[in-house]
Amino acid sequence: DFDREIAPILATYCLECHKDGNIKGKLNLTTKAGIEKGGKSGPAVVSGKVGKIETSPLLVRVMANEMPPKTPLPIKDKLLLEKWVLAGAIWGANPEAPIDPFRFSTSGRAGYDWWSLKALMPTATPMNFNLNPIDAFILEKLKGSGLSQNPQADKRTLLKRLSFDLIGLAPTPDEYANFLADVSTNSYEKQVDRLLASPHYGERWARHWLDVARFGETDGFERNQKRPNAWPYRDWVIRALNEDMPFDHFARLQIAGDVLEPNNPDAVRATGFLVGGVYNTVLGNDQMRSANRQDELEDLVGTVGQAFLGLTVNCARCHDHKFDPISMEDYYRMAATLSGVNHGERSLPLPGLAQKIENAERLTKNLETELEALEAPIRSALIKERAKTIPVTQHPPKPFISWDLRHALIDSETGLALQPQGPVQLTPSGARLADNSYLKSEPIGKTLHEKTLETWVQVNPGQQQGGAPVSLFKPIDATFDAIVYAELEKNRWMAGSDFFRRTKSFQSTDTLEPEPNTWVHLAITYHANGNITGYRDGKPYGQTYQSSGLLPFEAGQSRVLVGCRLEPAGGNKMFTGTIAQVRLYDRALTLEEVKSSFQHGDIWPNRREVVEKMPPKDQLRHKALLTQRIELTTELQKARSTQGEKAYAVVAQKPNETRILARGDHTKPGKLAKPGVLKALGELELDANASDTERRVHLARWMTSPENPLFARVAVNRLWLLHFGAGLVDTPSDFGFNGGQPSHPALLDWLATVFIQKKYSLKALHKLLVTCATYKQASTPRADALAKDVDNRLLWRMRKKRLEGEVLRDAMLQASGILNLQVGGPGFSDYKVTDTGNGTTYYEPFDSDAPELQRRSIYRFSPRGGETSMLDLFDCPDCATAAPKRTATTTPLQALNLWNGPIAIRLAGTMAEKIKNETKMNQEQVQQVYQKTLGRNPSEIEAKLAGELASQHGLRAVCRVLLNSNEFLMVE
């Protein structure tokens, strides 16, 4: 059977050197045509023709052990190949289908059949009803190696281990005393429940997740500017963990919370995960921006892939993954799925506000329908009468917003007002703008994608370069689309945009300056497909061009500016001239509609003129409806301008087209990549025009599906790593070929299955892990076990762990009695921030005894590249990259810093002073130092030596010694 027997042999042993992109000897073995064509030696085999070994160069070299060159084929596989060739080398069920080089694992790479990509195999627990199921798996493997587990650790050691593991703080003297005095059979389990219910549990485990999420509070790169509102994501992680949010929901919110639950502020905060990484704010030219965007997408794809799937998907940006079954197409499909994600700050939705806005919008729409029913017949009659002398092909289009600046600053359609900014002159000809004056509207009441900007202007050409008669502007991210004059090309109009992102030349041949005191009609249409078309005096202006795509201008966030491109206006190129009319349409007008609007000029009647022609009864009805509509408009504007808390989170944009880039080079786009996922884990492909919402929602649901074997495996392995010091898979973010193999594969799959069954409860999984006998073992080494398993992969003892840098700092603050346990809210900063004035920011650490700076380290401001001697020396990772598994070094500088560092000396002194204020007896003071640092009383010899040290060098010296002791630094 070719598909079951021959294809796996070719994929395993041959395709590394004989496939598309890597064809040695000009021999491609992935297709029937390739194998029949052969290479330098002629056809490799001839399909359908019964042959002999000698007639197949492929088989001759295989049987002679020349191929594969390094390791000959096993006898069994040689015989199968021989049988296949002699029978006529029939290709398979589909002769046209190539062999997928990723289908089978080989000695050099993983295939679709790699262990981590297979469905979960929930093996039955080994039969021992007296054991926690975890212990049954562990003991079965230990027994096979002739080893046994260590005895259980003493109660004091267990409580310290449990407390540091679950909340990152040492047990207090009272907690030690209560546990030691509790002789009930469930005393340990009660401590587990107490610690899991603590608000400090979320703080402890949020730190682990923030390492994976590469969370930082500055942008990185050379500017490295602060992100003052990044902290809401950190607080959300803490709350979610404390509330035991199901881990699948926890993951989905971080990928698509803002679109899954748009009215939930926590769901928006959660998307801080996607934008938690570095962000280059040095914009440069178009080429630099394009290259930078590809780097951002690589960070997104890599972070999502490693955090939730344990796969280095980002390694396939420039070529197919060298070791895992991930193609370039897979990578770019994932990149397309996340291509609507952008960095930025956004206001969080306020409870009930969205519903209030929705109700007001619905009522407004109903009122507008009634108003239109009254106005439409009269408006049509007036237009028809006025148009008798004008050769037009159709009625002019109805604008969404229309200002006639010769009469008023109030929109005749919606009542939206323009506010003068600076010395605007209102004349019978229109608004005369000079001396940096302009007009600004209130937020518009409708989200616009497609649109048309239209205006009648008189330009002062000698004073004009780069100003905008009309601009649609979104302050939240300073994006705008505008009609702009003479900025990039002298005497020419263009579609202005933020940093020229959607701006190209219209290629107009009209280079004459506008005549002074001559009215010019201008319109620019923005189409759904990204096309932008310019018009002047009702005719196409140059050529339509394809932009990078539409941006949404959201209701309540976007304004119309007249005479200015964007705010703040200082330093902007301003429009100088007179503007008579400004219109905004909620769609892209056609050529005929633009032509009609130009030809009609002033024949479009305003609302006042229409109402004057109504019968008195209709006028009264119209007035009542209009009054209600104006009240609703005011209410809507107030609601939309209500700002919630700010958070650094995903600012969604319309996804741009994604193409597979040759060697990852943004200047060499190739085949279109539709949004989708990894082929190795199942098919999911969306249309190329799918919205950002569709893309991220599908990704989040696919990724967290119980059918995805990686999601639960990766999650339970992270918890195992952090409790036991090493994962069942030793590479927590790489379950691919270069990652570790599971030490206990059956246990891993059993845990993943239980995790799913328990509805992804992390607290339930914690409890399962920390109540097993394997976790409660003593950490004492044994010679017999070390001889067989020096790395303790079989878990015959518990690993000793040194406190991580942040936990060490918190423990020192706790022992000194000044740890500030305030939970949540903006963090503290022990950095002096220096802005050089050229856009670069520096962060210099300092030490202080201010109470707000003694909070837990999870709340400490985290700048990228910020140095803090103690934390850095104790292996705190820089947040520029993810750190799924921290290193643990041992260096002389650690000892020097812990003994002589300013923080250590200050806290030792603080502890000594507090104790001396509480008791005057030297013996009691020494006892207090031991209780606060080690949670126990000193032995007789310890008390004697510590008393002598205190007498000679002061109590602070005793505090310094114990803060440097292994017993303080290590968790047994």
Q: Can you annotate each of these PLM segments?
A:
Residues 277-289, 309-312, 431, 495-498, ...:
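Active-site-adjacent bridging/hinge elements
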Residues 1-82, 91-140, 156-161, 171-177, ...:
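Solvent-exposed helix-loop boundary motif
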Residues 375-645, 812:
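Extracellular glycan-associated modules
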Residues 115, 221, 243, 275-405, ...:
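Active-site histidine-acidic residue metal-binding/catalytic motifs
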Residues 128-161, 165, 169-200, 215-262, ...:
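Primarily short, surface-exposed interaction patches in extracytoplasmic proteins
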Residues 19-22, 26-29, 70, 93-98, ...:
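Short, solvent-exposed loop/turn and secondary-structure capping segments
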Residues 187-328, 334-335, 339, 458-460, ...:
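Extended surface/linker regions that mediate inter-domain or inter-protein docking
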